[in-house]
Amino acid sequence: MEELGIVTPVEKAVEEKPAVKSYASLLAQLNGTVNNNSALSNVNSDIYFKLKKLEKEYELLTLQEDYIKDEQRHLKRELKRAQEEVKRIQSVPLVIGQFLEPIDQNTGIVSSTTGMSYVVRILSTLDRELLKPSMSVALHRHSNALVDILPPDSDSSISVMGENEKPDVTYADVGGLDMQKQEIREAVELPLVQADLYEQIGIDPPRGVLLYGPPGTGKTMLVKAVANSTKAAFIRVNGSEFVHKYLGEGPRMVRDVFRLARENAPSIIFIDEVDSIATKRFDAQTGSDREVQRILIELLTQMDGFDQSTNVKVIMATNRADTLDPALLRPGRLDRKIEFPSLRDRRERRLIFGTIASKMSLAPEADLDSLIIRNDSLSGAVIAAIMQEAGLRAVRKNRYVILQSDLEEAYATQVKTDNTVDKFDFYK
């Protein structure tokens, strides 16, 4: 029957089954497409809502940004007005004072140059970390408010001697004084240059040195040689400079000297004429005497307090060692005391004359030995004065060399006898 083209119903049914299957798959595919479209629509809806949400957040952030910018412009205007106000306050003439101690974040205790202490307000723009006791500050002239912090050495006359300011005196320029040279170099110069020697031996180098002796014996000149031979910072101050009009200024100056020395360590402090502030303490009856004793106490405290590792050495010179306070002379403060004798032996006089004459133009017949062998009491300053006077006499006579007659006349002029000394006793 297949050959005749006749298909039976069973065979027809068999042939129709793939069509049914194709329709079912098509229907399923259509349903899947609908589901996919529905899911895609849901995704697009979620993205749309997220977009709207982000747009609202963006608008909110934009408003916040505009508000912050307005607030920033307002704060800048306020800051500018505040800076102008601070500048106006600091532009008027200010009073120099001293900061004593803080009370809280906004107030503190200061002392003015009049000697009075005040509880004052502290300008809010100042760095509280920089406010230390004994610092120099600027006070408002009307309210005494603390408006500025001055540099540490702004109102101090103490300064470190620069390299170009150091004296050109060397040890070779100091005639004689061989023992004094050795002692001061061991106590001052050697610890600064070769500190490891003292560490190996196990001893501490001397803290301070006292040079004492009559006037004109070479104390200051030897200190100049020390300053020239070392690279340490050199601070020179006279004892009378510590005495001020207002109470507290002298001790503060002592603290400033040692603070400056510690900041520039290794350093040497030279206090000349120390007897003006370091005399023996007594029951003072006047304010000035009590102030001098406060200066001495501060000096003793600083010499006890500064650390050995800072390499700060103290040299003091005086003509009256017998008047100094025993607390200053004890070991631990002034460990080495070097005496400068007024009477020089013949060898010392020869060295001094030779040192001074080496820089002068002497005639070949000039005989220094005739002056050296004399037994008059001659200090180094007197010998220098003799040679200077001889040079002046040669200049007076339009000569370029110094003759023996110039030396004799200068010697007679400078070396006074008992009769000529009475001429200077005006107040008898």
UniProtKB/Swiss-Prot annotation:
One of its GO terms (molecular function) is proteasome-activating activity. Belongs to the AAA ATPase family. This is 26S proteasome regulatory subunit 6B homolog. The modification N-acetylmethionine is found at M1. The gene is RPT3. It is found in: Cytoplasm; Nucleus. SMART domains: AAA. Keywords: Acetylation, ATP-binding, Cytoplasm, Isopeptide bond, Nucleotide-binding, Nucleus, Proteasome, Ubl conjugation.
